[in-house]
Amino acid sequence: MTLRGADILARSLARGGARCVFTLSGNHIVPVFDAAIDAHLRIVHVRHEGAATHMADAWGRLTRDPGIALFTGGPGHANGVGPLMTALAAESPLVMLSGHVPLDQVGLDGFQELRQADMAAPAVKASWTAKSAAALGEDVARAMQVARSGRPGPVHLSIPSDLFEAPVEGADGAIPAAEAFRAVPAPLADRTAEAVIADLARAKRPLVLTGPTMANDRGRELRVSLAEVTGIPVLFMESPRGIADPSLGAVADVLAQADLVVLLGKKLDFTLKFGRPPTFDAACRFVQIDPDPEAIGRAARALGAPGRIVLTAVADTLPAAECLVRVGARRAPRRDGWTEDVQSAIRYRPAEWTTLATREGAVHPVAVGRAIRDYFARDPGAVYVSDGGEYSQWVQASVDASTRITNGPGGAIGGGVPFAIAASLARPDARVVLSTGDGSFGYHLAEYETAGRERASFVAVVGNDGCWNAEYQIQLRTYGRYRAIGCELSPAVRYDLAVSALGGYGELVTKGSDLAVALERAVQSGRPACLNVMVERVAAPAISHRAAAPTTSSG
């Protein structure tokens, strides 16, 4: 059998479990579009390459299979690279494929020639350029395997355009077997799990901290199970705000009391203040289970003092959690006040939030959060997506969603609309609700046309405060309001009308009392929708029993 390189590529993607390819067409990759037909791959054609990378990221987080992004070379590749950092920090399996100057033109200033693999390398787990049409199946298998293995993350492969049309004789064996695409396992030994459980049992105030790999449905189930079988608090962290993540309530108030912390796939990084005092007590000990030996080494350097890390293991996060649940179930769960202290801190929200949510005048962001929270109480299978800075922190702190996608530890904004589209495609039977600021919403507004064309349905609840508010708040704190500069946006922009013009459903909301019914109308429209909510300009909440959260306008 003779196949083109493009056919080998497309069929290998399908063999590896891919169903969708998020892409923007270009000269280099036209043969792949053709090959996708016979490989039964869905082409999701977007309006900007960055949006496609975000969509592949969200797809990977929700399905645990690598999301596939495909671009033409040169500027198309460059446009798609930026969101890779978000996917890397969020531990999202993703494969980015880029067209490339033909092999015989490399180094000769061919059309749109760039050192693409070098450009992508800092933001991915692996990056290389294909050399042979016959080996494209092996390249794809390697890319998908690396994306899935260890700490999941993005991988880049550039493919010279001449390889796509190159005929490969005897191509029957050019598409690898399914095993070649699977993750390389790194299990946690039962003996090690027993030692971890024993350490937890001996500790007086233990904690288990988990990271972004535990964000998906299976991760959430395991977090709940581990907490139940051990009786020990299990915290999930994925915010760039770290211990100040409003979703974690006042947890920062109690961390310094912990005497043992198990890092289950959670990096000891800036989000944990590197494990140092005063965030953690100087005598607090750490156990680290991580798929990356280098992450374990960095933790030891961050802590400095010898003896603070008492046990380490190189193991995959989800299987390690399964092992800990199984081994932990052999002991009776602990019952003491420490776990309730931690859970109480996480649940804590200042009493005045109720007043903020119901008062007249400008809509406070917490009112939006309460409206979305109430919707999720009625529809617990819905997917929550969060994007933006200050405004969405209030919403995140209010909404308890079983499935959520955020901008992750990388902290970049602008991916919300593409995330929501991919969530709708990955979960076609689920409702999708996005909270996003007006600044972040503007990044990929044109993708509403993509959403309508692809029959993706979601509701974006835009907090319109006419500002790049995160940076504005920094200016206020640092320089004062009279030296705030360059962060204003126009609050008069009718994002709702723009969405309507793109084929979606749009509605302007100016009163908090109208939020619930407006949200229901938007959901029932069945279209990609936008609620343009005029919100008060306030800083994100800083939740603590020791200090009141900011509640009044900062503008």
Show the residue positions of the predicted features:
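Phosphate/pyrophosphate-binding active-site segments
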Residues: 4, 134, 158, 171-172, ...
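N-terminal cationic-hydrophobic initiation segments that often serve targeting/anchoring roles
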Residues: 60, 147, 227, 373-377, ...
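Short acidic/His/Gly/Ser-rich catalytic and metal-binding motifs that mark active-site loops
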Residues: 32, 166-169, 296-298, 347-349, ...
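Short amphipathic alpha-helices and their capping/turn segments at secondary-structure boundaries
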Residues: 84-86, 144-145, 276, 375-377, ...
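N-terminal alpha/beta PP-like core and its mobile active-site loop of ThDP/TPP-dependent enzymes
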Residues: 1-334, 457-460, 478
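Active-site diphosphate/adenylate-binding microenvironment
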Residues: 6-9, 14, 24-37, 343-429
